């Protein structure tokens, strides 16, 4: 009985932690917020935690070219262009 209770409590903690790390607004809304540089505001970071903390290592131009060329399916490109390739 105690083991079951512990497992249920741990499952709830994991679920709550995952929910706090995810975007609370829609993907489109968070992309708009990010592209218009509203992520610096504390309340926006909380509403769009995943998107606001997702960055491209390469320039926006370079990642855009790579995405147009269909390179987003490659692991190294996904790591360098997380935001552009929707891999956050």
Curated annotation (Swiss-Prot):
Q: Where does it localize?
A: Secreted; Nematocyst
Q: What is the superkingdom listed in this entry's lineage?
A: Eukaryota
Taking the record's annotation, the residue ranges forming a coiled coil are none
Arranged from A to Z, the UniProt key words for this protein are: Disulfide bond, Ion channel impairing toxin, Nematocyst, Potassium channel impairing toxin, Secreted, Signal, Toxin, Voltage-gated potassium channel impairing toxin
* UniProt signal peptide: 1-19
Which tissues is it found in, per the record?
Expressed both outside and in acontia, a specialised envenomation structure laden with batteries of venom-containing nematocysts found only in the superfamily Metridioidea.
Q: Which cysteines are joined by disulfide bonds?
A: 54-88, 63-81, 72-85
- The UniProt record lists the ShKT domain at 54-88
Task: Tell me which InterPro entries the record gives.
Answer: ShKT_dom (IPR003582)
Briefly, what is this protein's role? Inhibits voltage-gated potassium channels (Kv1/KCNA).
Q: Which family does it belong to?
A: Belongs to the sea anemone type 1 potassium channel toxin family.
- Protein name per UniProt: KTx type I
